[in-house]
From Swiss-Prot:
GO terms for molecular function: catalase activity; heme binding; metal ion binding. Its cofactor is heme b. The active site is at 107 (proton acceptor). Bifunctional enzyme with both catalase and broad-spectrum peroxidase activity. GO terms for biological process: cellular response to hydrogen peroxide; hydrogen peroxide catabolic process. The gene is katG3. This is Catalase-peroxidase 3. It comes from Mycolicibacterium smegmatis (strain ATCC 700084 / mc(2)155). There is a cross-link at residues 106-228 (Tryptophyl-tyrosyl-methioninium (Trp-Tyr) (with M-254)). Keywords: Heme, Hydrogen peroxide, Iron, Metal-binding, Oxidoreductase, Peroxidase. The keyword Hydrolase does not apply.
Length: 744
């Protein structure tokens, strides 16, 4: 039996780790957390959309309006005062909180990963568990408390998310670093989300690597509870080259290339110090989530010495990188290449590096005692920039070109802190840079008159008469729009990047079949645009959506329930040169249960991947259910697979999927010739034994999972045909428009 959580209240953080404190363990975001021994149960809680009524700001609160009324100059002055006013309860190293606040913003934004777009600074998750209690985030709770007077003053005008990033910018600027810009627009969440942080059951454990350091997708950090990699080296081994391999993989999964990686590490470690005058396991109390009630959310109470200031204990590493730890300059790179380095133990017994033969003594100031000096200290991850051949070339180039280093750092910092915000039309405020970066997935502005209602009706008729089937039109529209990820607001139909590499060649999109549809739609588009030169035009992005909507309308009419499917216009077409192939490859679906597609290499079951994908599309459980059932009867399966097509009238938008799935006269058994995750099941007539239908795991989950079955029963009922069509159209319209943001 697991120990009671109460048993940990009076243990230090590291004592808790030593007894292998159990964390909630999942293999995917959609795996159950009930702990009752039902590992196949779906976690549908991730489909519970944030309810605006749970926000104390009310349903009608308009954050964009509030933020745009904010005086950023006044805010900057207030933050600067916080940064340079040391507090007795948590004294500032070197009299400046800049390095601490910079680390807070860095670790906040640095959780972002390209694999699923989760993490990042977008919703203020650093305030909640587990991030607020990550071992890598020790003492960042103090940084947030230092900013509370500022947050209190401005209230709803600035979210915690925006404030922490803006404060990080001001920290840099107050120490002499010119930043690239700042965009507001990050709205706070009011509770922790369901992000999957790894399979481990203990902090600082590593069960996410297999083979030769192959890191599980979609994770980026090398261990549970780290933001990046172990600063001592992989598995605490002080090997700079091995560390470089981990750094390169982790930063690549954060969306950073080698130049950006070197700039961020070298620039970040230009400031501040590490804190380890003694072993953290001997003096630190519980993390914020395990701290006693009277701590009011602060954790890691330190019993060593005064408990703060010169006696602050954070990681256990201990040292100062440069002679000017609160000033932007070239001192980190100068120091790194000025000495030969030997590995040594910190006072806490952790591996770090010092200049050989006592060199550098007396060159680094003490943060509190002006009469004391020290030698500089480096981490294994710092030495990686010197030892790795590719990093070394970049670092030496930066050393010889300070302006290039400063510009690369400023741009990389802006990318790090804004990468999860999505397209630039979501950015707010006067400090937004005018330059467009390719990682922002830019699309052209609308520079033409849009088609009107008569044009749309005529185009629908032409599309339906083009020889393209309902299945082809629906599948293409779905393939274009369903790439959207709510986590980082990437993907979607705007830009029509389904026409471009890499999307047009993704296996899930069946490139040869896709090319036929795109070619035929392009001919229709050209005819329309040529007939309206200088006037109304339609983009490929809009026409693809219009084709899907026309097909759904036709299918609904075929089922006896005619309905108008709305189609919002205003998308534009991105050129190939605005599309970074490697950057967009992160959006490629390894599975799409809505199309009954399962690629190779997926560890979670496909029904779990379905729920995860639905959460990225902001779908509720009923919306996910009605969409999948409708797409099955519309023939949207990958490769024309018959799995789950429970209808005698494919192409008609009927509720047949649910009616036949819940037919009590059908008995389901797995087919012996299929593998586990791609298993097929045969539905046999109980009386005759004849195979009536075949299904995938995903299909059967809508009758097996109790929640999904309850929803399916609604749509299988005799009075549900019209409701099914209405609900399908509503959910379809939602997905088609996810990337059309209202902000301008």
């Amino acid at each position: 039996m697991p120990e009671s959580p109460d048993a940990y209240v009076n243990r230090t953080y590291d004592q808790t780790v030593a007894v292998r404190r159990s964390l909630k363990r999942r293999n995917s975001p959609a795996a159950s957390e009930d702990g009752l021994g039902w590992p196949r149960r779906l976690n549908l809680r991730i489909l519970a959309q944030p309810c605006r009524t749970s926000s104390p700001l009310g349903e009608d609160f308009d954050y964009a309006k509030e933020f745009l009324s904010l005086d950023l100059d006044e805010l900057a002055r207030d933050i600067d005062e916080v940064l340079t006013t040391s507090q007795d309860w948590w004294p500032a190293d070197f009299g400046h909180y800049g390095p601490l606040v910079l680390r807070m913003a860095w670790h906040f934004a640095g959780t972002y990963r390209i694999g699923d777009g989760r993490g990042g600074a977008g919703a203020g998750m650093l305030r909640f568990a587990p991030l607020n209690s990550f071992p890598d985030n020790r003492n960042l709770d103090k940084a947030r408390r230092l900013l509370w007077p500022v947050k209190k003053k401005y209230g709803r005008k600035i979210s915690w998310s925006d404030l922490m990033i803006f404060a990080g910018n001001r920290a840099l600027e107050s120490m002499g670093c010119r930043t690239f810009g700042f965009a507001g627009g990050r709205e706070d969440a009011w509770e922790a989300d369901e992000t999957y942080w790894g399979p481990e059951s203990t902090w600082l454990a590593d069960e996410r690597h297999s083979g030769v350091r192959d890191l599980d997708q979609p994770l980026a950090a090398s261990e549970m509870g780290l933001i990046y990699v172990d600063p001592q080296g992989p598995a605490t081994l002080p090997d700079p080259l091995a560390s470089a391999r981990d750094i390169r993989e982790t930063f690549r999964r954060m969306g950073m290339n080698d130049e950006e990686t070197v700039a961020l590490i070298a620039g970040g470690h230009t400031f501040g110090k590490s804190h380890g005058p003694t072993d953290p396991s001997r003096c630190l109390g519980p993390e914020p989530e395990g701290a006693p009630l009277e701590a009011l959310g602060l954790g890691w109470v330190n019993s060593f010495g005064t408990g703060n200031g010169a006696d602050t204990v954070t990681s256990g590493l201990d040292g100062i990188w440069t002679a000017t730890p609160t000033k932007w300059d070239m001192s980190f790179l100068t120091t790194l290449f000025a000495y030969e380095w030997d590995v040594a133990l910190s006072p806490a017994g952790m591996w770090q590096w010092v200049p050989r033969n006592g060199a550098g003594a007396g060159t680094v100031p003490d943060p509190y005692d002006p009469s004391r000096t020290h030698a500089p200290t480096m981490l294994t991850t710092d030495l990686a920039l010197q030892e790795d051949p590719r990093y070394r070339v970049i670092a030496l180039r930066f050393l010889e070109n300070p302006d290039e280093f400063a510009d690369t750092f400023a741009r990389a910092w802006f990318k790090l802190t804004h990468i999860d915000m999505g397209p630039i039309q979501r950015y707010l405020g006067p400090l937004v840079p005018t330059e467009r970066m390719i990682w922002q997935d830019p699309v052209p502005h609308v520079d033409h008159e849009l088609a009107d209602a008569d044009d749309v009706a005529a185009l629908k008729r032409e599309i339906l008469g083009s020889g393209l089937s309902v299945s082809q039109l629906v599948t293409t529209a779905w393939a274009s729009a369903s790439t959207f990820r709510n986590s980082d607001k990437r993907g979607g139909a705007n830009g029509a990047r389904i026409r471009l590499e890499p999307q047009r060649s993704w296996a899930v999109n069946e490139p040869e079949k896709l090319a036929i549809v795109l070619d035929r739609l392009e001919r229709i588009r050209r005819r329309f645009n040529d007939s309206h030169r200088g006037g109304k035009q339609i983009s490929a992005a809009d026409l693809i959506m219009l084709g899907g909507c026309a097909a759904v309308e036709h299918a609904a009419a075929e089922a006896g329930h005619p309905i108008e499917v709305p189609c919002r216009l205003g998308r534009t077409d991105a050129p190939q040169e605005w599309t970074d192939i490697e950057w967009f490859s992160a959006l490629e679906p390894t599975a799409d249960a809505f199309r009954n597609y399962v690629g190779e290499g997926n560890r979670p079951p496909p029904e779990h991947l379905l729920v995860d994908r639905a959460s990225q599309l902001t779908l509720t459980a009923p919306q996910m259910t009605v969409l999948l059932g409708g797409l099955r009867v519309l023939g949207a399966n990958h490769g024309g697979s018959p799995l789950g097509v429970f209808t005698a009238s494919p192409g008609a938008l009927s509720n047949d999927f649910f009616v036949n799935l819940l037919d009590v006269n059908i008995e389901w058994t797995p087919r012996a010739d299929t593998a586990d995750w791609t298993a097929a099941y045969e539905g046999r007539d109980r009386r005759t034994g004849e195979v009536t239908w075949i299904a995938s795991r995903v299909d059967l989950s809508f009758a097996s999972d109790p929640v999904l079955r309850a929803i399916s029963e609604v749509y299988a009922s005799a009075d549900a045909e019209e409701k099914f069509v209405r609900d399908f159209v509503s959910a379809w319209d939602k997905v088609m428009n996810l990337d059309l943001f209202d902000r301008t």
